[in-house]
Design a protein with these regions (language model features):
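Anionic-ligand binding patches
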Residues: 2-4, 11-18, 23-198
Length: 198
């Protein structure tokens, strides 16, 4: 079976494509199909933006499509400074990975150098008739103003996010770290959601 993943983010593709391939699901990408549309993400939360992406790419290709979006919430920030659905878009400008690290390091520094944050994820599978939704979150982690040197292309904040349970940057987590902190690593549940809804 083939499914389109409506993202250009190489880290998201890598994170899920290998595990889905093990379940005999081939993940096609926007790049694979040479699609050059960019739906406007006007949703109020991760599920709404995931639906917008999934429907737009399904309408373009007629291939069952996965849309995914992330929201970032930072406990110590006032509402007007919350990234929410606009993690990459700051003041109307889309930031690249380096721009995100610079912006968020400065923001964290402004509020004391260490902030408590949480990712909330939304995934939608759309097949032209109906949509299936799944939402999950990672437990709280810390954003710090001193990023490590290593980078995870497509997930730049992994270089400045620390898992409190093991005091490691996300970019340095091993599979063993993730398995020990199972609450923080829910990808198997996401894979089950995809497999069960195709």
């Amino acid at each position: 079976m083939k499914i389109l993943f409506a993202t250009t983010n190489p880290a998201k593709i890598k994170r899920y494509a290998d595990k889905l391939r093990e379940k005999n699901i081939e993940v096609l990408t926007i790049k694979d199909l040479g699609i050059n549309i960019k739906p406007e993400e006007t949703g109020k939360n991760a599920i709404e933006n995931a639906y917008i992406k999934a429907k737009a790419y399904y309408d373009e290709t007629k291939i069952t499509t996965i849309g995914m979006d992330n929201n970032l919430y930072i406990e110590e920030l006032p509402e007007e400074k919350q990234p929410g659905t606009h993690v990459r878009r700051v003041n109307g400008k889309e930031l690249n990975d380096d721009g995100m690290i610079k912006y968020y390091c400065n923001l964290v520094k402004e509020y004391g150098g260490k902030l408590t944050a949480k990712w909330v994820y939304g995934m939608v599978i759309y097949d032209g008739k109906e949509s299936k939704e799944y939402s999950w979150s990672k437990s709280n982690f810390y954003l710090v103003d001193k990023p490590c040197e290593r980078r995870n292309s497509g997930y730049p904040l992994d270089s400045m996010s620390i898992m409190p349970e093991c005091n490691k940057y996300f970019v340095d987590l091993t599979e063993d770290d993730r398995n020990k902190n199972i609450e923080n690593y829910k990808e198997d549940d996401v894979i089950k959601f995809v497999v069960n809804n195709l």
